[in-house]
């Protein structure tokens, strides 16, 4: 199930993201804070994914009533945006190395983040959560390519290329791990179970390239895919392409 950031009330979402109206101004000291609710939601999403995440489930985790949660969070849509922004806060700005080293750091940091919080891959952020961590992330990503002779739109496009590649590659990796978990079989076991019948159904002469390359990949990786190695290969090629662009200026 895909969630969409920006699906909640824009005003209430921004208030949550930036800590406005953190708690009621009058009355007894509340049992909860918005930050505690967000942390609980992230713990649950890490363990169970977004599909089972609900205000009721979060309330159970915190030992309060659902209405207590609604005092701080209007609904799941707004909460998801805050969860994304908080997760982005785990990312670290790149150091002062070359532009290539800075972009490589950004790609690897994003790749690692998606593996720590796979539920991020269930969220489409075409309308990004405009919180402090998201804004800071975009700022230091742009700084990584500032001063290279690129136009502003090109700078944005380079950042989108690198982060989009990291997200796409992480999705393959996370999905491969999930397939193994759900099936109870490794890739190698799955191919071994499929091979006997497959050999009777497929004529190698009809698919000479697929047969040859598939065999080479299987021998090299022990499976049909190797997400980590694909990430390394793809990242190098992405950076090579950016280098060609920068060199043309």
Model-found features: residue ranges?
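Hydrophobic alpha-helical connector segments
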Residues: 92-136, 152-155, 159-162
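Amphipathic alpha-helical segments used for helix-helix packing
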Residues: 84, 111-133, 140, 171, ...
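Amphipathic alpha-helical interaction segments
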Residues: 36, 57, 78, 105, ...
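A structured, mid-to-C-terminal "fold-capping" secondary-structure block
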Residues: 2-3, 185-249
């Amino acid at each position: 199930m895909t969630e969409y950031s920006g699906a909640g009330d824009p005003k209430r979402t921004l208030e949550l993201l930036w800590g406005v109206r953190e708690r009621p101004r009058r009355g007894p000291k509340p049992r909860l804070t918005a930050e505690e609710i967000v942390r609980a939601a992230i713990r649950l999403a890490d363990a169970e994914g977004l599909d089972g995440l609900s205000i009721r489930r979060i309330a159970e985790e915190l030992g309060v009533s659902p209405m207590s949660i609604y005092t701080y969070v209007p609904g799941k849509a707004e909460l998801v945006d805050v969860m994304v922004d908080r997760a982005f806060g785990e990312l670290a700005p790149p150091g002062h190395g070359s532009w290539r080293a800075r972009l490589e750091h950004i790609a690897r940091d994003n790749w690692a983040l998606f593996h720590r919080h796979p539920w991020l891959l269930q969220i489409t952020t075409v309308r990004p959560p405009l919180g402090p961590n998201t804004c800071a992330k975009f700022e230091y990503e742009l700084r990584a390519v500032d001063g290279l002779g690129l136009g502003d739109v090109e700078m944005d496009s380079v950042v989108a290329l690198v982060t989009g590649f990291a997200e796409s590659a992480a999705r393959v990796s996370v999905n491969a791990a999930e397939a193994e978990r759900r099936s109870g079989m490794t890739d190698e076991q799955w191919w071994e179970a499929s091979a006997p019948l497959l050999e009777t159904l497929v004529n190698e002469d009809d698919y000479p390239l697929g047969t040859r390359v598939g065999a080479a990949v299987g021998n090299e990786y022990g499976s049909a895919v190797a997400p980590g190695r694909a990430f390394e290969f793809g990242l190098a090629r992405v950076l090579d392409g950016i280098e060609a662009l920068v060199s043309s200026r």
